[in-house]
Amino acid sequence: MGLPDSIQRYAPELWDSVRPLYDAGRYAEAADRGRELIEARPDQGFLYYNVACCESLAGRTADAIEHLRHAIDKWEGCREMAIGDSDFDPIRDEPAFQELVGR
């Protein structure tokens, strides 16, 4: 998904239950499951980023931007990653996304 392996290795097992949904294109379900994980582990910035990716692909623009904002708050590197991450293509032209990533 979005974050590099070096970041995901901190708690990859958290995303293991969601990854198959993402891989199957079931983005709304993946986002919903990811939100449950965030409730359990709000300290894990990669969860916010990956949920934002799923929400973007599921057409949940406002939710995607909000979760990306949280991810960036937890790790500034998410801002640069989001610029080139194709998961954000559906929302890339949104003013809120542009403002968030500084474009």
Regions found by a protein language model. Give the residues of each.
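Start-of-helix register in tetratricopeptide repeats
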Residues: P12, F46, E80-M81
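Canonical tetratricopeptide repeat
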Residues: N50, G84-D85
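Short coil turns that delineate tetratricopeptide repeat
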Residues: Q8, P42, E76-G77
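TPR-adjacent "capping" and linker segments in tetratricopeptide-repeat scaffold/adaptor proteins
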Residues: M1-L14, E36
